[in-house]
């Protein structure tokens, strides 16, 4: 049985209740009153509880900082650029979310290092322009340089860059041009099982070899290194005793598809808030005073 959970900040053991905070207050985060006792929950249920990081005293409680213009109008539709290296199943789900209203945005560009990959073919069949990055060593005329890539993204008015199975390191020029606007999805619970060389089935093999009881996707902001940016959301998937890497990968991918669409939906609705200590939180759509 699988368990779903959204985490902000690092993956921690569950606590006995979810917490919430107000954007305009620096009072301590207070627990919800209507929460069942943690001790009566199964391990899967405990892991599925939504939590935010614990904060100690009021004097040291970080404030929530909104990075929006403060206006009350509905957010405009955002323009998204998606980066892929393979079949692009997460890209397809995001594109479907844009079409069915789950995401208040549109995919305006597909960037890939493999011009004939499945994700690129899907983009072309749906009228989405495809760019090649980085330049191929054998065919340098086909690709873009880092500065050219930044220029094209700006020309298209891209608001957010979404990495969806893109296996190349993002250049510093792009990170600096789009601060806090580049997301990546990784098929394990970071900070464990991440870094250069850990991708695809290799990640799931490493999880099983470690004896970890839970795995699952992580969505994080991108910096200049592999898999080290601020964690925005995670979803826990229980590891079964006789799992194979392929079976675990299938269940984690199922969670990836749901989680990425949810998070992209939140970021397009301007529901990502930043604590003063640099931790990103997701604002609850139904209850704006609650953060995940």
UniProtKB/Swiss-Prot annotation:
Matching PROSITE patterns: GART
Residues binding N(1)-(5-phospho-beta-D-ribosyl)glycinamide: 88-90, 256
Enzyme type, top EC level: transferase
Main location: plastid
InterPro entries for this protein: Formyl_transf_N (IPR002376), Formyl_transf_N_sf (IPR036477), GART (IPR004607), GART_AS (IPR001555)
Recorded GO CC terms: chloroplast
Superkingdom of origin organism: Eukaryota
Site (Raises pKa of active site His): 227
Catalysed conversion reaction: N(1)-(5-phospho-beta-D-ribosyl)glycinamide + (6R)-10-formyltetrahydrofolate = N(2)-formyl-N(1)-(5-phospho-beta-D-ribosyl)glycinamide + (6S)-5,6,7,8-tetrahydrofolate + H(+)
Residues the entry annotates as binding (6R)-10-formyltetrahydrofolate: 167-170, 184, 227
GO biological process, one term: 'de novo' IMP biosynthetic process
Subcellular location: Plastid, Chloroplast
Pfam families, per database record: Formyl_trans_N
Keywords: Chloroplast, Plastid, Purine biosynthesis, Transferase, Transit peptide
Residue stretch of the organelle transit peptide: 1-65
EC number: 2.1.2.2
GO MF terms, alphabetically ordered: phosphoribosylglycinamide formyltransferase activity
Associated pathway: Purine metabolism; IMP biosynthesis via de novo pathway; N(2)-formyl-N(1)-(5-phospho-D-ribosyl)glycinamide from N(1)-(5-phospho-D-ribosyl)glycinamide (10-formyl THF route): step 1/1
Protein family per UniProt: Belongs to the GART family.
Record-given protein name: Phosphoribosylglycinamide formyltransferase, chloroplastic
Gene: PUR3
């Amino acid at each position: 049985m699988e368990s779903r959970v959204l985490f902000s900040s690092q993956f921690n053991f569950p606590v006995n209740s979810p917490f919430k905070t107000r954007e305009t207050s620096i009072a301590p985060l207070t627990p919800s009153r209507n929460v069942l006792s943690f001790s009566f929950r199964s391990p899967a249920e405990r892991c599925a509880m939504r939590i935010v990081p614990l904060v100690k005293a009021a004097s040291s409680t970080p404030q929530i900082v909104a990075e929006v213009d403060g206006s009350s109008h509905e957010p405009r539709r955002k323009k998204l650029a998606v980066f892929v290296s393979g079949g692009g199943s997460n890209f397809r789900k995001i594109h479907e979310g844009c079409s069915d209203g789950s995401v208040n945005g549109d995919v305006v560009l597909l960037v890939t290092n493999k011009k004939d990959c499945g994700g690129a073919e899907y983009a072309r069949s749906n009228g989405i322009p495809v760019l090649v990055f980085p330049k191929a060593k054998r065919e340098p005329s086909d690709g873009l340089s880092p500065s050219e890539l930044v220029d094209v993204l700006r020309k298209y008015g891209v608001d957010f860059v979404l990495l969806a199975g893109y296996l190349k390191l993002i250049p510093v020029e792009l990170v600096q041009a789009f601060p806090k606007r580049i997301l990546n999805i990784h098929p394990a619970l970071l900070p464990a099982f991440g870094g250069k060389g850990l991708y695809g089935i290799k990640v799931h093999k490493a999880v099983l070899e470690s004896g970890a009881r839970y795995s699952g996707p992580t969505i994080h902001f991108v910096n200049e290194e592999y898999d080290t940016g601020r964690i925005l959301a995670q979803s826990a998937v229980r590891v079964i005793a006789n799992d194979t890497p392929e079976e675990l990968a299938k269940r984690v991918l199922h969670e990836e598809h749901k989680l990425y669409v949810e998070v992209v939906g939140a970021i397009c609705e301007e529901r990502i808030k930043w604590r003063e200590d640099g931790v990103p939180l997701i604002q609850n759509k139904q209850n704006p005073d609650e953060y995940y």
